[in-house]
């Protein structure tokens, strides 16, 4: 099963996924956490097809892969293709948890390829629980509290 956390604000999606990852580790579930940028960098660190395929296989074997901040910045078509390959390898085999700040309908712009983004979304949401997180930004809440207390920075 996959889990997708969606919202365009800072409401604690990352903290929630980290907590789920910690609980998975306590259950002896092999878990890895990456930001989307870190994951894409890992997949594109080399031009060697052999190393890329080895990395894809290693990542696909992880029982719970947590990917934070999908689509916070645009990626190239080649990077999108590699991410698609990873999601295809994991599809119906291992679990993935993602966070994103944009709707699925906007992913095509970030992935530079609407067809690939649709295929990735299809694999992620099939057998998935999708949660739209609502609420006030934790960071803005803290800022408002500090402001109301007249805390001054020196």
Q: Which residues are covered by each model-predicted region?
A:
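Aromatic/hydrophobic pocket-lining residues that form π-stacking "cages" and hydrophobic walls in ligand
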Residues: 17-20, 86
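Post-Walker A helix-loop "phosphate-sensing" segment adjacent to the P-loop in P-loop NTPases
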Residues: 21-34
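Walker A/P-loop nucleotide-binding motif
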Residues: 1-16
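Short gly/pro-enriched beta-turn/loop segments at secondary-structure junctions
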Residues: 15, 26, 59-60
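Walker B motif beta-strand of ABC-family P-loop ATPases
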Residues: 64
């Amino acid at each position: 099963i996959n889990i997708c956390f969606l919202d365009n604000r800072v409401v604690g999606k990352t903290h929630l996924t980290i907590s789920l990852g910690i609980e998975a580790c306590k259950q002896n579930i092999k878990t890895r956490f990456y930001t989307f940028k870190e994951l894409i960098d890992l997949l594109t660190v080399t031009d060697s097809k052999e190393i890329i395929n080895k990395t894809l296989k290693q990542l696909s074997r992880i029982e719970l892969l947590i990917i934070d901040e999908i689509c916070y910045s645009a990626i190239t078509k080649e990077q999108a293709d590699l991410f698609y390959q990873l999601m295809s390898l994991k599809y119906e085999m291992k679990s993935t948890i993602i966070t994103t700040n944009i709707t699925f309908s906007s992913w095509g712009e970030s992935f530079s390829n609407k067809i690939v983004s649709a295929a990735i979304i299809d694999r992620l949401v099939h057998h998935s629980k999708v949660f739209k997180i609502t609420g006030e930004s934790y960071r803005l809440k803290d800022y408002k509290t500090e402001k109301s207390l007249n805390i001054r920075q020196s």
